[in-house]
């Protein structure tokens, strides 16, 4: 068993450190993906609450599978609409340890098109 950190853990720590340095007072758009679904939340860390969220498990997204870039794009568009309705337009993108590629990139692009700035 390896004593070192996995590549995923290393990326996660590096991203979180950069978020703390650059994030300032803006909420963060946190993304989590699994093999079947993708989840996005806009989190206000100062208040300790979730401002807006969307995932492929939502009732309005039930017809779409979460394992595609199209489904991730619809989640990005939905979370952007909900965040704008809550009064949030500027966020910091928190990809966690996930590579900015594929479904994560599709979600980010759709959130930008939906009006979120990051």
Swiss-Prot record:
InterPro entries: Ribosomal_uL18_bac-type, Ribosomal_uL18_bac/euk. Keywords: Ribonucleoprotein, Ribosomal protein, RNA-binding, rRNA-binding. It holds the Pfam family Ribosomal_L18p. It comes from the Bacteria. GO terms for biological process: translation. GO terms for cellular component: cytosolic large ribosomal subunit. Transmembrane segments: none annotated. GO terms for molecular function: 5S rRNA binding; structural constituent of ribosome. NCBIfam families: L18_bact. Belongs to the universal ribosomal protein uL18 family. Part of the 50S ribosomal subunit; part of the 5S rRNA/L5/L18/L25 subcomplex. Contacts the 5S and 23S rRNAs. This is one of the proteins that bind and probably mediate the attachment of the 5S RNA into the large ribosomal subunit, where it forms part of the central protuberance. This is Large ribosomal subunit protein uL18. It comes from Rhizorhabdus wittichii (strain DSM 6014 / CCUG 31198 / JCM 15750 / NBRC 105917 / EY 4224 / RW1) (Sphingomonas wittichii).
